[in-house]
Amino acid sequence: MSSSTIKTLAVAVTLLHLTRLALSTCPAACHCPLEAPKCAPGVGLVRDGCGCCKVCAKQLNEDCSKTQPCDHTKGLECNFGASSTALKGICRAQSEGRPCEYNSRIYQNGESFQPNCKHQCTCIDGAVGCIPLCPQELSLPNLGCPNPRLVKVSGQCCEEWVCDEDSIKDSLDDQDDLLGFDASEVELTRNNELIAIGKGSSLKRLPVFGTEPRVLYNPLHAHGQKCIVQTTSWSQCSKSCGTGISTRVTNDNSECRLVKETRICEVRPCGQPVYSSLKKGKKCSKTKKSPEPVRFTYAGCSSVKKYRPKYCGSCVDGRCCTPLQTRTVKMRFRCEDGEMFSKNVMMIQSCKCNYNCPHPNEASFRLYSLFNDIHKFRD
């Protein structure tokens, strides 16, 4: 091979390398679309690797790059393999993420799946979180709709609301004091559902809701209608130790739509000494405060600020300690690549110890199914 040919090949390789580097660098100025892209159900918006534009986060086993990052909130990262110059990689779960079990199947950390046509679920470090694919079934029907009911539509998975136009419309003001409950609502209670119908179009309160409903007039609601605002209590934490998930259902929003809210919770750190801190003669240690400020972690990201949270302790007589009073704090998290997001986090104020334990023995707890939910969690 002649020297001129070798030089030509060397120049070509150099130009190719420079081209790849140029494509992988960030622009001097950001130019983003006026409207954020619309993502598939369960897919969130994240900033690209240059910190410029919001893009739909890539999911497990999808191609990724600097401009198409993976979904950090699900514990995914872009794996470029052994190549240091690769421009594209594949979204993989971080190694520390734990798999999930659902319906006798194992799903990897960061994996998304549909257990049925009405839910889209994702495994996040041992916990399964789901979003509804039929939101119209969860929303409250128009309060001017007499005797509304959900009906199946041929060829569709989701049911739709229909109204009984032949019924006489009663005045809402005359029905505000007709709140009640009957046995037919037991199944709805089990499913954490809220419904605003009944005989004579009376508005009813289900016992799953811990507080009395309040009627609000909000000009943002459709046609300026009244909204019966109801919110369930937060469910118990999905894990007895370590980071878990707590949920509740509410329609306290501008559209009066029934939505599920989640928050991160930690009853106690895993590996917390059980009996070493008990005083002489004491059988329980109700509440313990972190000895030093710590950062909360979620999906491989850490809280921006440090906190000194309280945790629930343990007992030696078979009782278990669970949160009694809590509050919810919106917390900012930062990932290693600079991506930031906010999550609601449970902060314990006090704990109680009794024999009404969510599972027989916290020390031997391995598998826990969250009541009123379709999820399973594994430590």
From Swiss-Prot:
Stretches assigned to the VWFC domain: 98-164
One Pfam family hit: Cys_knot
Entry annotated with the keyword Metal-binding: no
Keywords: Cell adhesion, Chemotaxis, Disulfide bond, Growth factor binding, Heparin-binding, Phosphoprotein, Secreted, Signal
Record localization: Secreted
GO (cellular component) term, any one: membrane
SMART domains per the UniProt record, alphabetical: CT, IB, TSP1, VWC
UniProt key word Phosphoprotein: yes
InterPro entries, A to Z: CCN, Cys_knot_C, Glyco_hormone_CN, Growth_fac_rcpt_cys_sf, IGFBP-like, IGFBP_CNN, Insulin_GF-bd_Cys-rich_CS, TSP1_CCN
Region (Heparin-binding): 277-313
Annotated ranges, domain CTCK: 284-358
Major location category of this protein: secreted
Domain TSP type-1 intervals: 226-271
Function: Promotes cell proliferation, chemotaxis, angiogenesis and cell adhesion. Appears to play a role in wound healing by up-regulating, in skin fibroblasts, the expression of a number of genes involved in angiogenesis, inflammation and matrix remodeling including VEGA-A, VEGA-C, MMP1, MMP3, TIMP1, uPA, PAI-1 and integrins alpha-3 and alpha-5. CCN1-mediated gene regulation is dependent on heparin-binding. Down-regulates the expression of alpha-1 and alpha-2 subunits of collagen type-1.
Quaternary structure (record): Interaction with integrins is heparin- and cell-type-dependent and promotes cell adhesion.
Name this protein carries in UniProt: CCN family member 1
